[in-house]
């Protein structure tokens, strides 16, 4: 189960990173972001595309190096815990309908957080 979870995350983040790199205006618009200038687009590419690429590599390395799988699960717990917490705060402040397309990600992030919790508890080491 751990291998499937890590593989899913690696593929998920690789896909998002490629999408951000190939179509930054489309992806930022999909998220409700609009770069004000080329510097904003550069920042979007670095923060969204670059971070997603780094996460994809991290999860892929954890797949290849079993001794790092528990660390990858702990990262997932922290990552999705923070994302779900802040997205929940945004939903409560603004209304969940105001989250736009992020509502779809929110559901997936909750599932990935719950899976991370279950896997951390069940994985020795």
What are these regions (language model features)?
Residues 96-108:
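Non-cytosolic membrane-interface motifs at loop->transmembrane helix junctions
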Residues 12-38:
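Hydrophobic transmembrane helix segments
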Residues 82-93:
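Transmembrane alpha-helical segments of integral membrane proteins
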Residues 31-41, 66-71, 92-95:
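Short juxtamembrane and helix-loop transition motifs at transmembrane-helix boundaries
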Residues 1-13:
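Cytosolic juxtamembrane helix and N-cap/initiation of the first transmembrane helix
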Residues 69-79:
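Membrane-interfacial loop-to-transmembrane alpha-helix junctions, especially the N-terminal start
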Residues 111-125:
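Membrane-water interface at the C-terminal end of transmembrane alpha helices
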Residues 40-63, 78-82:
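Core segments of alpha-helical transmembrane spans in multipass integral membrane proteins
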């Amino acid at each position: 189960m751990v291998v499937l979870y890590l593989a899913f995350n690696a593929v998920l983040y690789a896909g998002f990173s490629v999408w951000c790199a190939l179509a930054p205006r489309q992806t930022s618009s999909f998220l409700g972001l609009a770069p004000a200038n080329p510097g904003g687009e550069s920042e979007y590419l670095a923060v969204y595309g670059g971070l997603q690429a780094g996460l994809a590599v991290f999860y892929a390395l954890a797949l290849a190096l079993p001794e790092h799988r528990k660390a990858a699960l702990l990262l997932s717990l922290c990552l999705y815990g923070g994302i779900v917490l802040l997205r929940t705060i945004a939903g409560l402040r603004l209304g969940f309908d105001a989250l736009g397309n992020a509502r779809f990600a929110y559901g997936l992030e909750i599932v990935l957080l719950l899976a991370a919790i279950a896997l951390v508890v069940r994985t020795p080491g």
